[in-house]
């Protein structure tokens, strides 16, 4: 018989740096999950992507066991990395803070494709360009 799901927990955690401190500890503690076990598994799985923010969806079962799925880093984080910026513009309509090329947008779209609800690469590129626009990043090309 299948285990009964008692909840989902969605978090964004730096790759390879999960620890029991907030926000991880309290979120998992509420559901009774073994926090250290999750941290060990997550850090081992995301070791290669160190420095990136990784969204994770944790499924908690009635016997306090869990599984988790890691997703691709948020488009905003990838855009900031490509544009070599610390943060986006506070006023994206007025102040442009950086630029990315069409090639960089395509690279990000290819990486994000599994997590986006786009039918083709062109649609995914449009989504990434919209994110860039809302951050005050100009897309050239």
Swiss-Prot record:
**Which superkingdom is the protein from?**
Bacteria
Q: Provide this UniProt record's keywords sorted from A to Z.
A: Methylation, Ribonucleoprotein, Ribosomal protein, RNA-binding, rRNA-binding
List cellular component terms (GO): cytosolic large ribosomal subunit
The biological process GO terms on file are: translation
Q: How does it assemble?
A: Part of the ribosomal stalk of the 50S ribosomal subunit. Interacts with L10 and the large rRNA to form the base of the stalk. L10 forms an elongated spine to which L12 dimers bind in a sequential fashion forming a multimeric L10(L12)X complex.
Q: Give the family, as the similarity comment puts it.
A: Belongs to the universal ribosomal protein uL11 family.
According to UniProt, the name of this protein is: Large ribosomal subunit protein uL11
Task: Give the organism, scientific name.
Answer: Chlorobium luteolum (strain DSM 273 / BCRC 81028 / 2530)
Question: Which gene name does the record give?
Answer: rplK
């Amino acid at each position: 018989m299948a285990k009964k799901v008692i909840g989902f927990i969605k978090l964004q955690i730096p790759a390879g740096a999960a620890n029991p401190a907030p926000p991880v500890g309290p979120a998992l503690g509420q559901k009774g999950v073994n926090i250290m076990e999750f941290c060990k598994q997550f850090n081992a799985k995301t070791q290669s992507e160190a420095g990136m923010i990784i969204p994770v969806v944790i499924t908690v079962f009635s016997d306090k066991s869990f599984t988790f799925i890691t997703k691709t880093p948020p488009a905003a984080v990838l855009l900031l990395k490509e544009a070599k910026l610390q943060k986006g513009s506070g006023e994206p309509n007025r102040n442009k803070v950086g630029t990315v090329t069409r090639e960089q947008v395509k690279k990000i779209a290819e990486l994000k494709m599994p997590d986006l609800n786009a039918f083709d690469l062109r649609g995914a590129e449009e989504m990434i360009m919209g994110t860039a626009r809302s951050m005050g990043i100009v897309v050239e090309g």
